Amino acid sequence: MEQAWRWYGPKDPVSLSDIRQAGATGIVTALHHIPNGEIWRIEEIKKRKTEIENAGLSWSVVESVPVHEEIKTQTGNYQKWINNYKQTLRNLAQCGIDTVCYNFMPVLDWTRTDLAYELPDGSKALRFDHIAFAAFELHILKRPDAEKAYNQEEQVAARTYYDKMSAQDITQLTRNIIAGLPGAEEGYTLDEFQTQLDRYKDISSEKFRTHLAYFLNEIVPVAQEVGIKMAIHPDDPPRPILGLPRIVSTIEDMQWFVETQPLPANGFTMCTGSYGVRSDNDLVKMIEQFADRIYFAHLRSTQREDNPLTFHKAAHLEGDVDMFNVVKALLNEEYRRLNQGETRLIPMRPDHGHQMLDDLRKKTNPGYSAIGRLKGLAEFRGLEMALKKVYFNK
C-alpha cells in the first residue's frame, strides 16, 4: 500500500518535512481555503501540488472536495454547485491527481463528544459518548422530537448527565459537536445549527438516496471520463444522529451504491474506524465483496464501551477492528491489481492517532497530532511487511 498522511495545508502544525520524516510518501489534502462549492482553479491546485512535491512528496489523494449542502438537500443553486464540482474534477485530473475522497453526510462531518479523552496511559483520544450526545440533543440543543431517538432509560441517563454539567461543560460539549472539526469546512452556532437540521426535516433516508443517486449520476461519468476515482467516505458514526438521514453505513448501503452508479470510477474509502463502530459490520467481508471499488483506506480502530453505542479511538492495532485480516484483505486486492498490470498502490493513511508524548504539550488538530500517527504508520508498515513475507512473496 502507498503510505500516505493527511495534511491540512500550510497552517497544519505538522509540516511536510515532519511527514516525510515519518516515512510517508503520499499526501492527502485539500484546498481548505476555497469556500464549499467554488471551483478549484488549476493555478491553485498546481500551487499546492508544487509545494508538496518540493518537499519530496506527492499529492496522492484529495480529501475532500466538499459536497455543498444545497446538493445534499437539492435546493437553491444545487445544479450550479454540481457543475462546479465537475469542473473541479476536470481541473484536478489535468494536474495529475487521480483519487478524490468525499462524503455525503448531512450538516456535520465526523462527530465526537470529547476531543481529549484521557486513556489509562495518559495519552488522549477522540470519544463519542452516546449519553453525552443525548444530553446535548435533549437539553442543550433541545431538538424537536429528539426524545423519539432515545428509550426511557437513555433519557433518564441523559438528564442525570446534563444535571451534573457546569456551564463550562455545556460550552465545551457544544463546541465539540457543532463548532467544526478538521475536515468539516463549516462550524455553526446553536441557532444556525438547528436551522441546518431543519432543512432535512422532510428528507427521509429514501429521499436522501435519490439525492445521492442524482449526484452520482452527474459526477461519476465525468470522473470516469477524466480518469479520477471517486471514493465515498462512510458516515461517522455509521448510524442516524440528530434526526438526519445516514445512507453510507452498512454493506447493504455499499451494494445500493454500486448498483445505483456502476461505472468503475464510483468507489469507496474503506474507513475501518467508521464502519467498524457497528458490531454488525464485517469489515473483511466488505473489503472482499467490494475489493475492486476500494480506492483509498483509512486505517484506525475503535473500542466500543459498556454502552455499545459509546466508543473511543483505540490504538491502531488494538480495539474492535481485526486489523490483521483487514490489511491482509487489502493486500490481496492490491496484488490482484498488480498482477493485472496496474501500478497504482492503494493509498492508506493512519487515521486519528492518539495525542501522546511531546504532543500533549502542543496545540494540535484533534485526532491529527504527529506522534500518534507516526506510531500508527510504523505499526502498519511492520504489519504489511510481515504479511507480505508470509503470504505474498512466494
Curated annotation (Swiss-Prot):
Pathway(s): Carbohydrate metabolism; pentose and glucuronate interconversion
Enzyme class: lyase
Biological-process GO terms, alphabetical: D-glucuronate catabolic process
Catalytic activity annotation: D-mannonate = 2-dehydro-3-deoxy-D-gluconate + H2O
Gene Ontology molecular function: ferrous iron binding; manganese ion binding; mannonate dehydratase activity
Record keywords, A-Z: Iron, Lyase, Manganese
One protein family per Pfam: UxuA
Domain of life of the organism encoding this protein: Bacteria
Assigned EC number: 4.2.1.8
Described purpose of this protein according to its UniProt entry: Catalyzes the dehydration of D-mannonate.
Protein name per its UniProtKB record: Mannonate dehydratase
Source species of the chain: Haemophilus influenzae (strain PittEE)
